[in-house]
Amino acid sequence: MRDFPFLRASADTVFDGVVGMLSVDELRELERMVATAATEELMSRFLRVEASHKADGSLITEADLEMQARLLRELARRWPAYAVLGEEMGAAEQEALMRGSDSGLWVLDPLDGTANFASGIPFFGVSIALMGDGRVQGGVVYDPVRRESFSALRGGGAWLNGETLVIDGPAPALRGAMGMVDLKRLPAELVQRFATRSPYRSQRSFGSVALDWCWLASERVQVYLHGGQKLWDYAAGSLVLAEAGGNGGLFEDYAGTRVEQLVLQPKIAIAATSTTLFEEWSGWLTAAMQGRG
């Protein structure tokens, strides 16, 4: 696990069958809970639901609300000691929950990729992470369309459908990499640079941040950039990437100022499948923002 400050194990952490605040068995139980709920609450409504707009202009559907309500109930019944912060809660409630997060807090995005879901595009997922002591302790990202369950425990590894997930393929140079880049949240000068002088082989953007991280962890893409992710977007997926051996994280700017603690405010995500590739990728971004790329 590399270069994710808020995911690192404390010096006094002891792993003895239980990794952090969740055991492997509990993680598998969480995966089953999420998969069952996603099948019943999301897939049953896919292609059959209408969307409305929230105050910030983003979309929301009945599926978002029903999935969140169900997981709130099930998490409270199974792990009553941990509160739940959901994307569809109000800002004041979210801030209050963050203030008490050190003792354990679930961070939930019940439907990541709502615009895709509402448009009939089969690329969306569920993201849930357990925070404690200022770090992500464990997480699950579930893709109900492909039935892929990505999971990770801090200091314990990452898995895809229960099989160990490790980045072990040869990393290409940046020019040969496939990029996952969300252009709409980037500064205009950076978008212009991508349009006129892109540094990679090709680029995609699929519309589900949590799955973006996991596709990077499974080496389907090799470099990643997103200009504004919130806590529920990246908490679980970034842990999957870190535990799989990827490199990168959350940043305050394009000059490499790393985010050192989990917060609700949007942050820049920059990552890659290897240290060498990450250094080349982040270096190109810094140079591009300075007009040198």
Roles of regions detected by a PLM:
Residues 2-111, 290-293:
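N-terminal subdomain of lithium-sensitive/metallo-dependent phosphomonoesterases centered on the IMPase/IPPase/PAP
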Residues 2-32, 194-197, 214-293:
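Oxyanion/phosphate-interacting regions
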Residues 42, 64, 75, 114, ...:
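Residue-level signal for inorganic ion chemistry
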Residues 128-214, 220, 260-293:
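Acidic beta-strand-loop-alpha-helix segment within the catalytic core
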